[in-house]
Amino acid sequence: MNLFTAENWKDYELLDCGDLEKLERFGNIVLRRPEPQALWQKQYSEQEWNKLADVKFIQKGSHAGEWKKNKPIADKWKIGYNYGDLSIKFNLSLTSFKHVGIFPEQALNWDFIFNTVKKLEVEQPRILNLFAYTGGASLAAKAAGGDVTHVDSIKQVINWSRENMESSNLKDIRWVVEDALKFVKREVKRGKKYNGIILDPPAYGIGTNGERWKLEDSINEILADISNLLDEKHFLVLNVYSLGLSPLILENLIQTNFRNVENLDLGEVYLNAQSGIKLPLGILARFNNINP
């Protein structure tokens, strides 16, 4: 099994993790927040964590909570990500759901997307980003010259993505507020084709009209539909964060839904902590039929 990690961050760093928490630096601000995967003990002492953390997330329910500041910091700030010719910006915010507007481990896929879109021997490759959140993958694809369609079921998240596009000095991403599965089925009926499809589906979710999404129930269906959307020259990136799935399950889903899969990368995504621990953050399958 392969291990994949983001190696080009300057504005982000995982400092330590353990005891169901993680300590992270986003720009100049250090956050302490829950991490269900961190089952081991912390490597740094509680005293060190308290000294380093600018703000801590306090869980108040199963899905929400509040931030307690140890130092006077802004509720909103920006960080940048650079990789070769790629230079993008993210607007971060302390949300009541413990998220800040970015999943830093996904930078490894931004690099892949940026490189792969540039290699496509197609004028303005068509790229579809599903469950797209605040749009890191959309920004990478757009910066590489792609014609990008960004789909998410939450309007506020789409607005956040648009701010990131503008902060990154990019333009003309197509925004779609819709349930991803419904959108894909409609695109299949229309006979649409895409050179690249990216999806990072949640374990659970609710669509624009209350549609319930459960990863294990719907992943095979959406991949079967997506297989009809890939153009002759194509790539696919599938990232999932669910304790119920494994790289072998992803491999079976890919091999049974897509024909003649080439250059398949398969494995676990992680972040390296400053303290020496590896934090697992989902599993990844990606492939392309583009010659190197």
Which residues does each PLM region occupy?
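S-adenosyl-L-methionine
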Residues: 154-198
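Conserved SAM-binding loop of SAM-dependent methyltransferases across substrates and taxa
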Residues: 134-146
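Conserved SAM-binding motif I beta-strand of class I
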Residues: 147-152
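Mobile active-site "lid"/loop adjacent to the S-adenosyl-L-methionine
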Residues: 155-157, 177, 194-225
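C-terminal catalytic and target-recognition region of SAM-dependent MTase-like enzymes
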Residues: 233-292
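Conserved alpha-helix/loop element of class I SAM-dependent methyltransferases that forms part
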Residues: 104-122
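Non-catalytic substrate-recognition/targeting regions of SAM-dependent transferases
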Residues: 10-24, 31-104, 111
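Conserved class I S-adenosyl-L-methionine
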Residues: 123-133
